[in-house]
Amino acid sequence: MGKKRSASSSRWLAEHFKDQFVQKAHKQKLRSRAYFKLDEIQQSDRLFRPGMTVVDLGAAPGGWSQYAVTQIGNQGRIIACDILDMNPIVGVDFLQGDFREVSVLNALLARVGDEMVDVVMSDMAPNFSGMPSVDIPRAMYLVELALDMCRQVLAPKGSFVVKVFQGEGFDDYLRDIRSMFTTVKVRKPEASRDRSREVYIVATGYKG
């Protein structure tokens, strides 16, 4: 006999399937509603151009990579990583592994090679416990790792887009990004649920 769903998980599922962006993604055969978040960011901030090299952290199920491919074209390149498996996308070099592990980081850097990256994007999030005192530090650790990736591979004048959950450490993190990039915006895309703490920091003009 299967486990009975909790009231909160049942509410989440009901909300999820009524979500207009979930429905739209399903109709258009897109990987996830995250596709629309990145599309909105691209419309306002113009991160992608044909021929770019992009690193996608926390890529599965592939919404961001799927969108980025449409912007960078056949001459572009995407190196994606996630702890979860992801169905192949043409033009995306996918590495499955835990980005927190040094061996996975090194494998990712090996795939990037000597070429500098034009955009680093991170949609990483931890498994949430429902306890902000636990969840926020876990989430901040992941976004710090994403920023470290910028320091290692991002080309001068490159861009960074990262999902961040507002809470302890957010202001300090934003301050660090502002010290590293010329222009920094905090975005809340329409496809992001109102009650979610998530926002997207969009940083352009990496100082290198």
Swiss-Prot record:
EC number: 2.1.1.166
GO cellular component: a single term: cytoplasm
One family name in Pfam for this protein: FtsJ
Keywords: Cytoplasm, Methyltransferase, rRNA processing, S-adenosyl-L-methionine, Transferase
UniProt keyword annotation of Cell inner membrane present: no
Reactions the enzyme catalyzes: uridine(2552) in 23S rRNA + S-adenosyl-L-methionine = 2'-O-methyluridine(2552) in 23S rRNA + S-adenosyl-L-homocysteine + H(+)
Record-annotated active site: K163
GO molecular function, one term: rRNA (uridine-2'-O-)-methyltransferase activity
Compartments (UniProt record): Cytoplasm
Residues involved in S-adenosyl-L-methionine binding: G62, W64, D82, D98, D123
InterPro entries: RNA_methyltr_RlmE, RNA_MeTrfase_FtsJ_dom, rRNA-MeTfrase_E, rRNA_MeTrfase_gammaproteobac, SAM-dependent_MTases_sf
SUPFAM superfamilies named among the record's database cross-references: S-adenosyl-L-methionine-dependent methyltransferases
Family: Belongs to the class I-like SAM-binding methyltransferase superfamily. RNA methyltransferase RlmE family.
Role this protein plays: Specifically methylates the uridine in position 2552 of 23S rRNA at the 2'-O position of the ribose in the fully assembled 50S ribosomal subunit.
Official protein name in the record: Ribosomal RNA large subunit methyltransferase E
